[in-house]
A protein has these predicted regions:
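Secretory targeting signals
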Residues: 1-4, 11-43
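N-terminal secretory signal peptides and thylakoid transit peptides that target proteins
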Residues: 38-55
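C-terminal segment of classical bacterial N-terminal signal peptides
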Residues: 58-65
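Hydrophobic, well-structured mid-protein blocks that either form specific transmembrane helices
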Residues: 166-200
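Short, structured patches in soluble enzyme cores that scaffold and shape functional sites
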Residues: 125, 156, 160-162, 180-185, ...
Length: 302
């Protein structure tokens, strides 16, 4: 069944279906109201079959959108997590957050690991752990629950526009959309406690606001970051200071290694590791993060 509408649809190149609310009429293209041709018009079997086919097509066209709308719907909406892009009205939708651990030799040593080129390890944070910080803003960052030893870790973050599996390192940067400055905030006492018990330490890394992030800068404008000064200061005193060239695994190598274990996709972001001298923050501290080639990022612990 279909509902008649006020419309005219060509049929088989010779007839026209004229839909009216109270009737369905066939006419030929050159027929005029009241003309002899119109009075003599008598639909043939071919005309009637074409009419039925057209009516079915109209019916299906009207029913399809309704059927789609009638499909399963979420019981409640879940907000989409996005990151602003500098110079763009569009935003970057986040799919997953990957983080690499101990990717600077000096930081590996201070965390009790071998600084040699051992295989990298990764962990994840929930996408809704992101706290966006605008350029020029000093954003309030809440001191989290359960910890008495809250640490800063400043990092370069890569944002992917595409992905795949087993990506060669020499092709990996082709998948990078852009870069941002980030903070991997850590409840160090909880992380260390779980590590001592040989248990997963998500509670120390994966919590609300744990992924602080500046806006994304397209790589088409900044180029790729393989070297450059990176630092963090607390209340004007520099605490972390290093260079991206001191990474054990480059961003390209991280992407290649990750793609061996996971299918990477557009929307994935990668925290590329922090240099040495991570340390605690307390309420009232103002953190200033710097990365050569990107605007500064700042938060206040509240």
């Amino acid at each position: 069944m279909f509902e008649a509408r006020n419309s005219a649809v060509p049929v088989a190149g010779t007839l026209k279906i004229d839909y009216q609310p109270d009737r369905l009429r066939l006419t030929r293209p050159n027929d005029k109201e009241g003309s002899p041709e119109m009075k003599r018009t008598s639909p043939t079997r071919r005309d009637l079959l074409a009419t039925a086919a057209a009516a079915t097509a109209v019916s299906m066209a009207e029913v399809a959108p309704a059927a789609a709308q009638a499909g399963p719907k979420p019981i409640f909406p879940v907000p989409m997590v996005t990151i602003p892009i500098v110079g763009e009205s569009q935003v970057f939708q986040v799919r997953r957050i990957y983080c690499i651990g101990r990717n600077y030799a000096a930081h590996a040593i201070e965390r009790g690991s071998d600084p040699n080129r051992e295989p990298p390890f990764f962990f994840q944070k929930p996408t809704d752990a992101i706290q966006n910080v605008a350029v020029g803003e000093v954003a309030d960052h809440p001191y989290p629950s359960l910890t008495k030893n809250y640490h800063h870790e400043v990092e370069l973050v890569a944002a992917l526009k595409s992905g795949g599996t087993n990506i060669p390192a020499d092709k990996a940067l082709d998948h990078v959309y852009g870069y941002a400055l980030g903070l991997d905030m850590t409840r160090r006492d909880l992380q260390n406690g779980m590590a001592a018990e040989k248990k997963p330490w998500e509670i120390g890394k994966s919590f609300d606001h744990a992924a602080v992030l500046g806006p994304i800068h397209p790589a088409s404008k900044t180029g790729h970051f393989e070297k450059g000064a990176i630092s963090l200061a607390i209340n004007g005193t520099v605490k972390q200071s290093s260079d991206l060239s001191k990474m054990i695994w480059s961003v390209a190598e991280q992407i290649a290694k990750l793609s061996e274990a996971f299918e990477l996709k557009a929307g994935d972001i990668i925290y590329s590791g922090t240099p040495e001298n991570v340390g605690p923050v307390v309420k009232g501290d103002v953190l200033l993060c710097k990365l050569e080639g990107l605007p500064d990022m700042s938060i206040k612990i509240v």
